[in-house]
Each structure stands twice: as C-alpha cells, then as structure tokens.
Regions:
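Glycine/proline-rich active-site loop of Rossmann-fold NAD(P)-dependent oxidoreductases
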Residues: 329-334
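Mid-domain Rossmann-like dinucleotide-binding core that forms the NAD(H)/NADP(H) cofactor-binding site
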Residues: 125-203, 207
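Short glycine-centered segments of the SAM/dcSAM-binding site in methyltransferase folds
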Residues: 86, 150, 174, 240-242, ...
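NAD(P)H dinucleotide-binding glycine-rich loop of Rossmann-like/cofactor-binding domains
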Residues: 67-72, 83-155, 197, 306
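Glycine-rich phosphate-binding loop and adjacent beta-alpha segment
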Residues: 227-307, 341-363
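Glycine-rich beta-strand-centered segment in the early N-terminal region that forms part
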Residues: 28-46, 52-93
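A glycine-rich helix->loop->beta "capping" turn
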Residues: 212-219
Length: 363
C-alpha cells in the first residue's frame, strides 16, 4: 500500500489557488513510533482559513496541506487510542498519516476519539466540531441575541453561517440570512428556518436587506465583508453587536485580506461610534475550552432535528484542490468535505468515482 497526498508547489501562494498551486505526490505509508498512531483519513474538511496556512506555509516543509480530518486508527502505539477507533485529527490532504508524539499540529486541534452514537462522524469537522464551536462562541457567547432582536448572518448557507443563524432562532431572535443563488436562499428559509434571506447577487442588495430588517439590525454575524458589509452598515441599531468571524470576500486579494479587518473598522467607525456598536473579533482557538459545553448544547439539538446541517461531500482524494477552490469562490452548497476512504459507520460505503479537477498537478 502506498500513500498519496497533496502538497504545495514551490511557488508562493498568492490570490486564489491556481492550477499549479498543489502537487499530488506518492510515498510510503508511515510507521508509528512509540506514542504515535497510524490513521487512515476518511473525511477531509475544507475551510477558508486553510488558505492562510498555505500562504504562510505553516507546518513542515513538503508535508501534506493542512486540514482537519476524521480518520480511523489502523495501528496504535499511543496510550488511550486503539486500532479501529474513529478520531478527529489533522491529517491534512492525505490518505494516511501519523498522529501523536512529535507530529506537528495546530496547538488547539487536539486529537480526540469520536462516538458514532452522538452523530455522524463527518460532523466532527462540522456542526459538532470547530464550525459548531465557531458559531456557538460567536453567536451565543459573544453576540448573545435576545428574543425579538433582528439578527443578520452573511454566508448563511455555509458551514458556520447555517449553524449561527439557527442558534439565534433558538434564542427567539428574528433571523435574516444573506446568501448567493436562489437555491441557497430557499434552503436558508425553507430548511433552516430563517425568517428571510436576501441574495448578495441582487443588484438591489442594500434595498432588499433594508426591507426585511425593519427597524434595523441588532446583531450581525460577519463572514463575508465587501459589499455585504456595506449593505449592513447603515442598518445598525443603537447598541448593536457585530461578531467578525471571517471576510471571505477578501481572501482572494493578493495580500490575503490581512489588513481588511482594520480597513473594515475604519470604514465603519463613524456609525460604530455614534450608534455605540460593539465590534468583536472571533478567534475560535480562544474558545477551545468550551468545546464540551458546545457539544452538550448543540448535539441534542442536531439529533432532535432542531438544528439542521447540510454537507457538500465530494468524492476522492483527486478532487480536493478543485473542491477547495470551489469552496473559496462560494460555489459549494453547505459544509465542504471530501471523502477519501470508506466510512465504516455508513456500511463501509467508499468514495465514488474520482475525477481529476482543473486545480493541481501530479508529480
């Protein structure tokens, strides 16, 4: 058995991913040392923050591109983990990887065993994982919407947005989504239960949003920036709150949008000051200690169908770069995942036919 994985090409990563950004390589399956476990990747989570890791070349040189993953242990020499266990870990864009002692990972992304009875194991990198924690922290712990307040969520059909809006509904707020094409807006209202949804593709976005946000916005969960923020800005009520989760509209900028939060603050400063708007930057790593609290709150809601969650699952390791680019462009529909090996909890159903997309080259 050989191991295939995607790594970065030698050229610096700027702007959006290009055809030659990633290279598919093949090597030996690693052997676990004492304190390590060998795992087979089942699901790879694709998220906007990974583009920053790629630009900064975070992690070991030549290693697989970073990603959060759901995996199964093949061989363990690591206390507390046994062969057959399902785990959350950070294998990245690869079929096999080690976890444990001496294996690089972001500090707060600690490997943990998964209980398949709590929810689908894929949810460990979605609604019951970092995305769920992001939504829970940003909405419940930071913005804290109250009954009958008006809450607006941008990228409302995305991995974080769909959860954040439903959490606000659970608290009795009136929730307005901002999404893209009509099918996404329909999903946000009909399936997720938002009170209304407007399209950022509309030439009358500002007027559309104002019409459904009377008498103004009390909470804004920001995932986008750009023209969406411009439409929201004049609608803030007195003492409103804004949680800045992401600014995906700027991730394709040559500088990666690194100064966009400062620019956004400067653009909004006159209204923020006169209307006493509280602006909060969300960094999910600061809430790692609330993971179990989030699970205790959110898992029962998901299991009971009170919080719904859509995944966009692509099939096969070869599709990862293309799926990643589509996610960044907003062409995905729900939380973007790639399944690279069979999920035994679903009757060992393996990934479907792979296709080589337009992004990435084979070494």
């Amino acid at each position: 058995v050989r191991n295939r994985y995607w790594t970065l090409a030698d050229e610096p990563v700027t702007g959006w991913p290009q055809q030659d950004t990633f290279v598919l390589k093949e090597g030996a399956v690693p052997v676990p040392a004492l304190g390590q476990a060998l795992t087979r990747t089942i699901y790879v989570s694709l998220d906007p923050y990974q583009l920053y890791y790629q630009r900064e070349r975070t992690g070991p040189e030549g290693a697989p591109c970073h990603a959060r993953t759901v995996s199964q242990i093949i061989e363990s020499r690591m206390d507390g983990f046994a062969a057959g266990d399902f785990v959350f870990n950070t294998n990245g864009w690869t079929e096999y990887a080690l976890m444990g002692e001496g294996v690089w990972r972001p500090g707060y992304m600690v490997p943990r065993k998964l209980d398949a009875s709590v929810g689908r194991i894929s949810q460990a990198v979605g609604v019951l994982g970092m995305l769920g924690l992001t939504a829970y922290a940003g909405m419940n712990l930071m913005a804290s919407p109250q009954p009958n307040e008006i809450v607006v969520v941008s990228a409302a059909s995305g991995g974080v947005g769909q959860i954040a809006g439903q959490l606000a509904k659970q608290r009795g707020a009136r929730v307005i989504g901002i999404a893209g094409r009509d099918a996404k807006c329909k999903f946000v209202t009909d399936d997720l239960g938002f009170d209304a949804c407007v399209s950022h593709l509309s030439p009358t976005l500002s007027a559309d949003l104002a019409a459904v946000c009377q008498p103004g916005i009390d909470v804004y969960f920001e995932n986008v920036g750009g023209k969406v923020f411009e439409a929201v800005l004049p609608l803030f009520n007195q003492a409103a709150r804004m949680t800045i989760c992401g600014l995906i509209a700027h991730y394709g900028d040559e500088d990666g949008g690194v100064d966009r939060r400062a620019a956004l603050m400067k653009r909004g400063e006159p209204i923020f000051k006169t209307r006493d708007v509280r602006v909060m930057n969300l960094s999910v790593s600061e809430f790692a200690g609330q993971h179990e609290e989030m699970l205790a709150y959110l898992a029962p809601l998901v299991k009971a169908g009170k919080v719904k969650y859509r995944e966009d699952i692509r099939q096969g390791l070869e599709t990862i770069p293309t799926a990643f680019a589509e996610m960044l462009r907003g062409d995905s529909f729900g939380k973007m995942l790639v399944q690279v090996s069979p999920d035994p909890t679903l009757g060992a159903r393996g990934p479907g036919k792979s296709r080589q997309g337009p992004f990435g080259t084979v070494a």
